[in-house]
């Protein structure tokens, strides 16, 4: 386990200016809108987006589930590759999704200890959760293109993609949507800007405009976990009795239950749980349906977030019917596939 924190990319690497020439419209015979960003991604390898220093935690499948999640919290990571010593290979990923699934599946009441969390090993949970349907870990080579990485993330509906050296078999990094977006943003100003970057979220159809997944502040943590499991979203807007967004409850808040040893009582309200939030949290980052994609990407990169952003342009009239001005932007694919154990 490497203990140093991830080093941010602060400046453009020294690149030959000819790198960008082949992306100019007159060179490729297309309008700036056509495939500019795709071609850029195809020209860069996953290795290019790997920071010079990062933190990586790897778990053996014989480790107890509880210890694994506590280690994730202590090291500030949201996922870890799983190593099977018998097979001598990486077999999956342990993520916050697994913690949520365990709590939601086995929790009964504050009076009953969650035996499965306290005593099960990772390999036991994998057998219960996957029920024998083990799939090969989705990974990528450092020499593969960023386009391949993006395609794999979308195609497999995962949030994290292990970059594995094909020679040594070592995991070099966990590539995410956030990291790729941050890397791409560094070069965006050097490329012709497609017209869709000037279009609004509404025009592009980005976001969820109906049946937005949310949770009331008086609802229990267990109910929130149920929504995470059913809807497979990254975060839930928290609303008061007037339907106004007052906070955000994320999957990372759920993993913090392990740090606080609070997972044995999931009947507490979301409001009370958020008051115990130990990590720094600013106001809910918002965006609006009338804002352009360019503006939103700038905001996401600036604030270093990549999760649903609540967009209340007007307060809701009732809790049952969401106001058309409210949008939930999902900037990442839904968490399924090998995002959870596979």
Where are these regions (language model features)?
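Tandem CBS (Cystathionine beta-synthase) repeat/Bateman regulatory domains
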Residues: 1-342
